[in-house]
Amino acid sequence: MIIMIPIYAITWNFRDTPEGFDKIVNNDYNYFESLCKKSSIDEFVILITCNRVEIYAYTRNEIDKDLFKDSLIYNYPESTMHLLRVASGLESMSIGENDIMRQVKEAYELSIKRKTSGKILSYIFKKALNVGKEVRTQTSISRGKTSIPAISLDICDNEYGINNKSILIIGNGKMATDFSRYLKEYRPGNVTIAGRSIDHARNLAVLYGYSYDSIKNLNNLIKNSDIIIAATSAGNYIVKDLGDLARNKYFIDISKPENIDPEISKYARLLSINEIGKILKRNEDEKKGEVEIAEVIINQEQKTIDEKLKEMMLDDVIAMFYKFANNVKKDELEELFLIQDFNDEQKKDIDAMTSSLINKILAPYTNSVKQFIKENKNFDYILNEYKKMLEQFMENIVKKL
């Protein structure tokens, strides 16, 4: 049984919304956080990677779709299914990539730090991380090199060699960061990060003990490098018109659109994103069986999520009973203590007795209501109607008080 719960996945990604993704990808976290606040979203987690920008939202308010132009919006249960697939590496450009697990975890941890996620999204993200781990444990979907930078460097090392080579990384974003990290295992010579922002280039270079420079000095940097890696979000050729300067060098361009003019392949080896894409497609075909096993795991876990969310929704409604009863108790006791004189010990005993009385009176009733709603095939409709009825009842009582 599918239940309706206001959990959404708002996504711009390389596969489903490529044009929208290209428009939105250069915005930072604060930009997307401001969109969520403008739309009055109750809980949200923002995931930003090289190939996707996604907002997972739980809200009782209607989402302002005009704020999230060119995106694809999933409703529940497709929203949580999408997150499970993302965490498992099934939605990655390179099927089974491991980096996405770290990125999902970091996105969730940042939401906790910024206090934008609550009970609902915390449960779902913890579940997604567990599912991602289980998929990788129960299948071979993440075997071998799985990320685009890792695959690119592996090809480069086999064809050209990386050890002791002088390397230039053009860009300082997420993909450039991944290249910087993976390069360490190949023991390169000098590595230089070149970016439009010298401050951003410096920040990345310092993390790994590399050099940094401005992209304004590009031709000179290329002249002094053996391997040139382009990993930016620029929509044009950054590396072009090199002529003989390109000879005996190795170029890697994982940017889309391309950052390196294909004409360079006349003078040097150019490993392009299109060539890497063919390798990724071959890997995807080889992993079809593992994907099917992963989908079985995901579908089973989605059923568990359905049941748990039903429990959480029911608990919220039942909590309304007790909150209302305790508010009435508080008002009545305050009035009682004003007209009669009780010492502190007596007040404490009366408060405990009335709390116990509330629990004993409400428990059988609320438990039977909870069981009735849970077992009814029209769970969602009955729960919502019951909640509206309860809210109206409380509102009327408060007016009388």
UniProtKB/Swiss-Prot annotation:
Protein name per UniProt: Glutamyl-tRNA reductase
Pathway(s) per entry: Porphyrin-containing compound metabolism; protoporphyrin-IX biosynthesis; 5-aminolevulinate from L-glutamyl-tRNA(Glu): step 1/2
InterPro entries registered for this protein in UniProt: 4pyrrol_synth_GluRdtase (IPR000343), 4pyrrol_synth_GluRdtase_dimer (IPR015896), 4pyrrol_synth_GluRdtase_N (IPR015895), GluRdtase_CS (IPR018214), GluRdtase_dimer_dom_sf (IPR036453), GluRdtase_N_sf (IPR036343), NAD(P)-bd_dom_sf (IPR036291), Shikm_DH/Glu-tRNA_Rdtase (IPR006151)
EC identifiers of the protein: 1.2.1.70
Site for Important for activity, residues: 82
Subunit record text: Homodimer.
Catalytic residues, chain numbering: 50 (nucleophile)
Comment field (misc): During catalysis, the active site Cys acts as a nucleophile attacking the alpha-carbonyl group of tRNA-bound glutamate with the formation of a thioester intermediate between enzyme and glutamate, and the concomitant release of tRNA(Glu). The thioester intermediate is finally reduced by direct hydride transfer from NADPH, to form the product GSA.
Function recorded in the entry: Catalyzes the NADPH-dependent reduction of glutamyl-tRNA(Glu) to glutamate 1-semialdehyde (GSA).
Domain notes: Possesses an unusual extended V-shaped dimeric structure with each monomer consisting of three distinct domains arranged along a curved 'spinal' alpha-helix. The N-terminal catalytic domain specifically recognizes the glutamate moiety of the substrate. The second domain is the NADPH-binding domain, and the third C-terminal domain is responsible for dimerization.
UniProt-annotated binding residues for substrate: 49-52, 92, 97-99, 103
Family: Belongs to the glutamyl-tRNA reductase family.
Keywords, in A-Z order: NADP, Oxidoreductase, Porphyrin biosynthesis
GO molecular function, one term: NADP binding
Native source species: Picrophilus torridus (strain ATCC 700027 / DSM 9790 / JCM 10055 / NBRC 100828 / KAW 2/3)
Family matches, as Pfam families: GlutR_dimer, GlutR_N, Shikimate_DH
Catalytic activity as recorded in UniProt: (S)-4-amino-5-oxopentanoate + tRNA(Glu) + NADP(+) = L-glutamyl-tRNA(Glu) + NADPH + H(+)
UniProt binding sites for NADP(+): 171-176
Keyword Isomerase carried by entry: no
Disulfide bonds: none
Superkingdom assignment: Archaea
One GO process term, biological-process aspect: protoporphyrinogen IX biosynthetic process from glutamate
Gene name for this UniProt entry: hemA
